Amino acid sequence: MGRIKSSSGRCSTARLEAVAVLVVVFGVASSSLRGCIAQQSGGGLTRGSFPEGFVFGTASAAYQYEGAVKEDGRGQTIWDTFAHTFGKITDFSNADVAVDQYHRFEEDIQLMADMGMDAYRFSIAWSRIYPNGVGQVNQAGIDHYNKLIDALLAKGIQPYVTLYHWDLPQALEDKYKGWLDRQIVDDFAAYAETCFREFGDRVKHWITLNEPHTVAIQGYDAGLQAPGRCSVLLHLYCKAGNSGTEPYVVAHHFILAHAAAASIYRTKYKATQNGQLGIAFDVMWFEPMSNTTIDIEAAKRAQEFQLGWFADPFFFGDYPATMRARVGERLPRFTADEAAVVKGALDFVGINHYTTYYTRHNNTNIIGTLLNNTLADTGTVSLPFKNGKPIGDRANSIWLYIVPRGMRSLMNYVKERYNSPPVYITENGMDDSNNPFISIKDALKDSKRIKYHNDYLTNLAASIKEDGCDVRGYFAWSLLDNWEWAAGYSSRFGLYFVDYKDNLKRYPKNSVQWFKALLKT
């Protein structure tokens, strides 16, 4: 997953428990509450609650699922390096095996089909296609993803393919520091074109990047995820990096990389393949801590430093004016030619949404003095508590509070700010702990997860039917319990329980039956 989390596609990291303040802060985002709010719980959801053609699926990521890290010519990635660095992963695990989907994809596709899922969002490992990031194509990698795509289509499941879900080839990190160098734009575009050419006859929905905001913050500001660069707390945690500049450089290159890939697709492949390209943005929703003007403005500003940072250039041709004013010369500028290519380069908006926080104006200099980073630039503080009371019930991950109304508010924000773009919820879900003292039988009783999906989907349906938001699909994170980035195997997001002690056997949680009933009605 991707998120301040480590996830899913999330970015959840259990290590944030030791630095709860950093957790909240580094997942900045927010805006004033808009739109009507549906009840926290809703009943009677069916397929008919959503428009005709609305897509239901589950989501995954290559590094979290595949395993087989040294098979069939796959090259090393920055996450291989990070996971094998002592102290980086909460449970000291790695994803060398993960849930072994590389070998078990046919079994897992059958699980999706049995539930009645329409689509599967998975990522291609760049280092399986180009082991060194560039150069010679690895045919074994091409063959594997052809088999996966064909197997999905044979079961009537549409592939939604992510090109980059955090697993940069280590060779490019070694060669020129990866996303910090402008060369990455051309190398990513070349990799993307190879995927368009090889798989585009069957893949009609491409997600070029998963959670670029999470990568910029967790990888280059907080240093809690690969490649683990930062300068916060006087480099006590990271050996190298600059938290005040590198996140902005990396973000700029992400935006240019998507635009370059989109330009190639539209010029050479769109006419014959007729696919669409988007990005999966990680977006927390934030409500003002109070109804004061200063907190309302802080919430808006925080959201601009999250979604606006990465989405505004595609709709308006530049970063938010608030960022220009507060970041100054540290925020890169688009040339006129670059802005022309970037603006309009999104066919749809992917949203990875899990939780909602309160946001207030930061009226102290402590954060700026200690961190000197993007959080300090926002001038905000985001917390899941107000007056000592949590904003909602908490899942297992310390960052994940269950606030279904945030889904509807966020959809209205996207509709209003970006003039009703097509939206897919590319990730949404919650986790349980990997508790060794709970039996498998009890672990399958996930009523909390059922309520989570029911309530978030109820608010999503209301945003479509009552508010006119153009939302076209929903992907649950995740099909299986899996390796959750810096949280390792300590966090279970799956609809299916994976027995890590017994050959990775898959067992359906009660939420599987809930989705099956939803999708059949």
From Swiss-Prot:
One Pfam family cited in the UniProt record for this chain: Glyco_hydro_1
Annotated phenotype, changing residue 284 to N: Decreases the kcat/Km values 7 to 30-fold depending on the substrate
pH profile: Optimum pH is 4.5.
Effect seen on changing residue 427 to Q: Decreases activity toward gibberellin A4 beta-D-glucosyl ester 200-fold
Keywords, alphabetical: Disulfide bond, Glycoprotein, Glycosidase, Hydrolase, Secreted, Signal
Signal peptide: 1-38
Covalent S-S links between cysteines: 230-238
Family matches, as InterPro entries: Glyco_hydro_1 (IPR001360), Glyco_hydro_1_N_CS (IPR033132), Glycoside_hydrolase_SF (IPR017853)
Residues the entry annotates as binding a beta-D-glucoside: 64, 165, 210-211, 354, 427, 477, 484-485, 493
GO cellular component, one term: extracellular region
GO MF, one example: glucan endo-1,3-beta-D-glucosidase activity
The protein's enzyme class: hydrolase
Subcellular location: Secreted
Glycosylated residues, chain numbering: 291, 362, 372
Record EC number: 3.2.1.21
Gene Ontology biological-process annotations: carbohydrate metabolic process
Active site: 211, 427
Catalysed transformations (reactions): Hydrolysis of terminal, non-reducing beta-D-glucosyl residues with release of beta-D-glucose
Subunit structure of this chain's protein: Homodimer.
Family: Belongs to the glycosyl hydrolase 1 family.
Function: Hydrolyzes glycosides, oligosaccharides and hydrophobic glycosides. Possesses gibberellin ester beta-D-glucosidase activity. Can hydrolyze gibberellin A4 beta-D-glucosyl ester in vitro.
Listed name of the protein: Beta-glucosidase 6
